[in-house]
Each structure stands twice: as C-alpha cells, then as structure tokens.
Amino acid sequence: MSWQTYVDDHLMCEIEGNHLTSAAIIGQDGSVWAQSSTFPQFKPEEITAIMNDFNEPGSLAPTGLYLSGTKYMVIQGEPGAVIRGKKGPGGVTVKKTNQALIIGIYDEPMTPGQCNMIVERLGDYLIDQGL
C-alpha cells in the first residue's frame, strides 16, 4: 500500500459524516511521504520544532505549534507521542511513529476527539508495523 493510500483512505476518511480538513505523513527529517491536496505548505523549521517537542516535551507550549505560519495553541498531549493544538473551532493532532509524523488538521463540525482518533489509530498501526 502506498503512503498516499494511507492518507486518502485512512486519514481523509469520513467519520460520522465529517472528515479532516487536511492530512499528511511526513518523515521525521521533514520530507513529505504523502499528503492531501489541501495540506498547507509548511516550513522545515516548523517540523524541526515539532520534533524538538517530542524529544523535550513542553518546548512548544510557550510559543505555540506553527504549521504553514498558522499558530496553534498547544493543549494536552502525550509527552513524546502526541502533540495536540487548537486554533478557534479547529486544530491539529500530530502523532509520532518510529520514522514519521502523522498530521491531521480539522475544523468544525469535526471534533478534536474525532481527529485524535483518526490520527492516533493510524499512528499506532504504523508503530505496530515497525514504521
């Protein structure tokens, strides 16, 4: 299965009539493995900052999580495993696997819980596969 299929079928899937605004699977080095057509163009330093927070949990909290210049307020996550951000009625979930970052961006009417479930479910599966 291609990485694009994971994005299209597992991240951009419909859940209770809603779906993510955009999603991507990005290597920990910042290389794009696959992304939805709507995923924003991010800056390499934004991925570096996210990786730093996984290595030093809490480092993003004072500054916020930036993706494509958009600032998300960092909310509760799982240190070293999941970072969650909020901006208005939407937000972002980032799940770290052994080799990649799974990123889901959502907006109303999708809920934070639905986004978390989609992103973390695929992340957990990839971790189980050694990826």
UniProtKB/Swiss-Prot annotation:
Metal-binding in keyword set: no
GO cellular component, one term: cytoskeleton
Xref: Gene3D superfamilies: Dynein light chain 2a, cytoplasmic
Superkingdom of origin organism: Eukaryota
Record-linked Pfam families: Profilin
Keyword DNA-binding among UniProt keywords: no
Stored InterPro entries: PFN (IPR048278), PFN_euk (IPR005455), PFN_sf (IPR036140), Profilin_CS (IPR027310)
Location(s) in or outside the cell: Cytoplasm, Cytoskeleton
Alphabetical UniProt keywords: Actin-binding, Cytoplasm, Cytoskeleton
GO molecular function: actin binding
Function comment: Binds to actin and affects the structure of the cytoskeleton. At high concentrations, profilin prevents the polymerization of actin, whereas it enhances it at low concentrations. By binding to PIP2, it inhibits the formation of IP3 and DG.
Family stated for the protein in its record: Belongs to the profilin family.
Quaternary data: Occurs in many kinds of cells as a complex with monomeric actin in a 1:1 ratio.
PANTHER family cross-referenced by the UniProt entry: PROFILIN, PROFILIN-1
Protein's name in the database: Profilin-1
The gene coding this protein: PRO1
